[in-house]
Amino acid sequence: MSSPQDRAQQYIGQLDKELSKYPTLNNLEKTTGVPKAYAVIGLVALYFFLIIFNLGGQLLTNLAGFVLPGYYSLNALFTASKQDDTQWLTYWVVFSLFTVIESLISVVYWFPFYFTFKFVFLLWLSLPTFKGAETIFRSFLAPTLGRYFQNGSTASGLRAKADAVHTD
């Protein structure tokens, strides 16, 4: 049985191999002498630290909630598949709801570590491994609000309207 230190080194090796695909990180490693895996782990740890202690927590959380989902949403727009549309449309509805609630009430003062929990929740919603937005759609939005949208799925209806405008 391998020790925790051996397993950690194995994971760092896998991360280093994955990060080797990015020339910028390879150049950073050559320039600074710091292994790219350690640099990325350090930056991620700093990012979490800043969010946990609310040093720019709102900005960093919203940035994380926008960049990766924005990339995947744009990718979904350019694919013919409709499977990913539900995930990303639901994500943006939930993300927008959080943003509106934050602006209406000072939830930050009532709930300690709010931005930490929001950050973890947004990761759960957006990461393809978890597909949390799809889970929320299937378990909450579809059963409660589905009766108001009887003309098929909202994603396919929106796509059909966009295609109709584009062809005119």
From Swiss-Prot:
Residues on Cytoplasmic side: 1-35, 77-86, 125-168
Keyword Endoplasmic reticulum recorded: yes
Lumenal side: 56, 104-105
GO molecular-function term, one example from the UniProt record: membrane bending activity
Transmembrane feature ranges: 36-55, 57-76, 87-103, 106-124
Kinase in keyword set: no
Disulfide bridge map: none
InterPro entries assigned to the protein according to its UniProt record, in alphabetical order: TB2_DP1_HVA22
Subcellular location(s) per record: Endoplasmic reticulum membrane; Golgi apparatus membrane
GO cellular component, one term: endoplasmic reticulum membrane
One BP annotation, GO: vesicle-mediated transport
One Pfam family it belongs to: TB2_DP1_HVA22
Keywords: Endoplasmic reticulum, Golgi apparatus, Membrane, Transmembrane, Transmembrane helix
Membrane topology type: Multi-pass membrane protein
Subunit structure: Oligomer.
UniProt free text on domains: The short lumenal loops between transmembrane domains 1 and 2 and between transmembrane domains 3 and 4 may impart a wedge-like configuration, thus deforming membranes.
Family membership: Belongs to the DP1 family.
Reported function: Required to generate and maintain the structure of the tubular endoplasmic reticulum network and the vacuole. Induces high curvature in membranes and causes membrane tubule formation. Involved in membrane/vesicle trafficking.
Name of this chain's protein: Protein yop-1
Gene symbol of the encoding locus: yop-1
